[in-house]
């Protein structure tokens, strides 16, 4: 499952790379209780109006009420799935492309490494190409908050940096690290998929092989939160494409949101460092309150009907994981929902969901 573009490597070279990562969870998901498995309780009263929330799910898939072209919808209240709806032909086992929601998973992988003492966000990133110039001052925190100061163009409608990186480069992080410094580190916020791929390259450098890196991500993050068959795609160089290319089910995206809702703890086990979620939700100083550490924030009230403490993973074309701590909610919406002529009304959807509590 998944694909890698043929760039700077032959098909024979890529097919010769075999990564032996054991992804067998050792249990059957359909007969294992939520959240580690897919056996969902239908009798737990969380205090939400289930009839109303499921009416909203039906209206969402109607297309004409909230707009957009949604593919999947999952709502957790107090950790329990209370609504789930899919477009015909899709279902709970369908894996959906994350696009930039993958950046938030990169945050989580970094968090696990930091909990284990392998990385320090206050330290310089240590990129070899930067060691003899001002870029040597860029810290992991600057990269996580997208305040590296590196020149970057994230315009998807042109031959931009992001399009060149994703579709024309065999080693995406190498392309990103060559960008010159445009602003002093920590002083300017610039949304950059290049930054996320620099981070995944630094993560890869913590291991002695590609296989060890992939196994670490699976064993210490994904499997720990019940995600057993997600695919984190790699570029031809072997680095995880931490900016854009993760495939997972809607339930798995909900599990990921639940990890953050529960302050980095899942099933009673601490996965992320204590204080990591608070750090993640702290606005980057130059972001005007809209961005934390590879998560979007609602401090600037982009979604006025939602509480200010809401934060989210967001991907191209409207892939969303909304996390609402004060309402004990996780809302997953996947699909094709950002067309200018038919954008999904996420604020209206959130408003109506909140009315059901």
Question: Model-found features: residue ranges?
Answer:
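Short, charged, amphipathic alpha-helices and their helix-cap/turn boundaries
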Residues: 51-52, 59, 80-85, 159-185, ...
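N-terminal leader/targeting segments and the immediately adjacent pre-domain N-terminus
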Residues: 1-91, 145, 356-357
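Active-site Gly/Thr loop motif
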Residues: 227-234, 281-330
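Short active-site loop at a secondary-structure junction
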Residues: 64-72, 87-118, 122-131, 184-191, ...
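Conserved catalytic neighborhood of penicillin-recognizing serine enzymes
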Residues: 131-160, 165-187, 194-197, 248-251, ...
